[in-house]
Amino acid sequence: MMRALAVLLPLVFALAAVETAQAGVVVVMKTSKGDITIELDEAKAPISVKNFLSYVDAKFYDGTVFHRVIPGFMIQGGGLTPDMVEKPAKPPIRNEAGNGLKNNRGSIAMARMQELNSATSQFYINHVDNPNLDTMKYAVFGRVVKGIEVVDAIAAVPTGTIKGYADAPRQPITIVSVRRAETK
């Protein structure tokens, strides 16, 4: 009995350590439509996660809006005020597409211009699986673990062209705050 315990106990601790190591940083995005909990994958997207968290920690996203909403595609935010004015962002980061993470429903990825290494603060959350975005090298860095119904609600709002931005919600969908989740 003691010999079995001596073998099993280290195994239990080792498995617990692996589980802890695999858990990524979690953030809670409070929006005017509800909360979205997102797990970030530091192991596969360290540059994107570090960049995103630098904006989170600076409270940059507080008061910004989802400015591009396309049902059956994605919801995009993280850079514009409710008046559709772009906030000044930090320099762009290196693209981490091809890291094994896919643009599947509920994944969060860096929005960018045509230039591969042009992502700054803006991100999008996939409303559906979008494998074409993997081919186009859009870098995923996490996934929604709670609140996918909020993503669905945001994707369902009426949109139009507002101040030159197509697919903008007619009523602003505000990102109230994004914070690191409390660890237990």
Question: Residue locations for each model-derived region?
Answer:
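Cyclophilin-like peptidyl-prolyl cis-trans isomerases
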Residues: 12-184
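Bacterial N-terminal signal peptides that target proteins for export
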Residues: 1-9
